[in-house]
Amino acid sequence: MKRVAILGSTGSIGVQALDVVGRFPDRFEVVGLAAGRNAPRLLEQIRRFRPRVVSVCDEAAARAVRAEAPPGTEVLSGDAGAVAVASHPDAAFVLAAISGGAGLRSTAAAIEAGKPVGLANKESMVLAGELLMARAAAKGVAILPVDSEHSAIHQSLVGHNRGEVRRLILTASGGPLRCTPEAELATVTPERALKHPNWSMGDKITIDSATLMNKGLEVIEARWLFGVEQQRIDIVVHPESVVHSMVEYVDGSIVAQLGISDMRGPISYAMGHPERMPLDLPPLDLGRLGKLTFEPPDPARFPAYTLAYRALELGGTAPAVLSGADEAAVAAFLARRCSFTEIAEVCADVLEAHVVEPVRSVEQALAASEHGRREAEKRVGARAHAPASR
């Protein structure tokens, strides 16, 4: 029986992780849950899984949960609450799925407590990947990726010598706007950009998929997770989302992981590792699929992913600043305060204006991300009030 804590339990990944737990009651016991403000969903989870401790983002939500939670469940709040769940002494595995930079402190706490981590929070690696991997190595902690692409790379590396890797190849669906002409992108609405063809995800990551910023952030994540320089990490657009990513070896051989588009696959791989668990999911029928297509990404239409390579080139706090700027720009787009194409423009402006410093602590990484967010908000506001060109 593996005792697990799930951070971000009411989000998309957290809900699917609990679905996996529910399928294997003899394998998993939930000891802790951390959520945002969705008290009704968290209460449903508490009643079903009976965790010992839960946390929500603020005290108001905590009071609402305490009023209805069954006896025996401790209810905490804020960052300190999420950290307590992540480092709970009874947890033998922590799934880190709190979205955005908000998940960094709890992810770091799990590592410091010596817990194996299933990492679904890519921003932790983007903000402080070098630091976290160093701490994980010092603590002897395994970090198992939950992003489908990084899970695919992890699976494609099993049994191989890391020194024989030539490059990593991350696949991208291309998002809902893959075939949209460049001239139309500036007028794309949030509703259109949120219609992902293959995956069901939260709003922020879906917009990042549409801009290809998500793939850029995954390049940063892969750079630290697998210790491969960005010059040896490539992106290829693969609309079917069947090949989840690939590893090319020095002899020219490519090993890939294929599967249907269902996050319960990589979630169960991380949670059950080193064993695989039988999932009642539809099989991948390659005969019916008929073909797999691949194409290079188009930096002219979707320049956002190139900013991630630039951030890695700059080093230090640059990736954290880029991540924060993207969070603010995407929020502005969803609120109709900036256009789709302005997301990348704002992020590029913030990144190039930033004075880079080495990342020496989690708090410094978070401060850099917050700086990027503030600078992006300023630029969105300035653009909104700029006179129209004649």
Swiss-Prot record:
Q: Which GO terms describe its molecular function?
A: 1-deoxy-D-xylulose-5-phosphate reductoisomerase activity; manganese ion binding; NADPH binding
Q: Which cofactor does it need?
A: Mg(2+); Mn(2+)
Q: Highest lineage ranks of the organism?
A: Bacteria, Pseudomonadati, Myxococcota, Myxococcia, Myxococcales
* Keywords from the UniProt entry: Isoprene biosynthesis, Manganese, Metal-binding, NADP, Oxidoreductase
The gene for this chain is dxr
> What protein does this entry describe?
1-deoxy-D-xylulose 5-phosphate reductoisomerase
Which Enzyme Commission number(s) are listed? 1.1.1.267
Ranges in coiled-coil conformation: none
- Annotated organism of origin: Anaeromyxobacter dehalogenans (strain 2CP-1 / ATCC BAA-258)
One Pfam family, short name please?
A: DXP_reductoisom
The entry's NADPH-binding residues are: 10-13, 36-38, 121, 123, 202
Cite the record's Basic and acidic residues compositional bias ranges.
Answer: 370-380
Q: What class of enzyme is it?
A: oxidoreductase
Q: Which reaction does it catalyse?
A: 2-C-methyl-D-erythritol 4-phosphate + NADP(+) = 1-deoxy-D-xylulose 5-phosphate + NADPH + H(+)
The answer to whether the entry has keyword Isomerase is: no
Spans annotated as Disordered? 367-390
Relate the protein's function as given in its record: Catalyzes the NADPH-dependent rearrangement and reduction of 1-deoxy-D-xylulose-5-phosphate (DXP) to 2-C-methyl-D-erythritol 4-phosphate (MEP).
Which family does the UniProt entry place this protein in? Belongs to the DXR family.
Binding-site residues for 1-deoxy-D-xylulose 5-phosphate, renumbered to this chain = 122, 148-149, 173, 196, 209, 214-215, 218
Query: Which residues does the annotation say bind Mn(2+)?
Result: 147, 149, 218
Annotated pathway: Isoprenoid biosynthesis; isopentenyl diphosphate biosynthesis via DXP pathway; isopentenyl diphosphate from 1-deoxy-D-xylulose 5-phosphate: step 1/6
One GO biological process this protein is involved in is: isopentenyl diphosphate biosynthetic process, methylerythritol 4-phosphate pathway involved in terpenoid biosynthetic process
